[in-house]
Amino acid sequence: MYKRQGNGSTNAITLDGDENMQPDWVWVKDRGRAGYNHNSYDSVRGATKLIWQNLTNAENTYADSLTSFNSDGFTLGADSSNGEVNVNTQSYVAWNWKESATAGFDIVTFTGSGGTQNISHSLSAKPEWIITKSRSASGAWYTYHGANTAAPETDFLKLNDTDATADNATVWNDTAPTTSVFTVGSAFDNTTTYI
């Protein structure tokens, strides 16, 4: 986790200590102003590609938001178009993750089929937490957690919602993840791209 103040211009954020790394997922949140979004960037989709974690909106491109992933952190632009990650004098927090099978974290993309699909991952272990989001269309943040219920593959949560756990076979196809794949069902629309 990194806490900092925005400066409204190009701002290279250097991670140090336990976080001395190139992050592959950066989650930025304004700490001081109410009503601002959770901003999510990752190295698989590429810098400037933003998805708001608390909303169902499709992916957006903001050329002056998070502009690069660096070997020791990331760079933010002036943020004039989004206004949620680097406004001058505003206080922010950024959570950072490194994609690594050893660390138990993987980022994958896939295109939905509207039916049952096995999605490959590179963890070599059964995922305990899966978060999915459509990139090319609006849609829910379907979330799986291995400790959610006695049969978590039958249930889901939504990251963008405060609803309780729901039971619906169209999300995970009532199929537990394995050491090489997780399964999605018809809730993942045909030709829609997902992360």
Feature locations, PLM:
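Surface-exposed molecular-recognition determinants
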Residues: 3-195
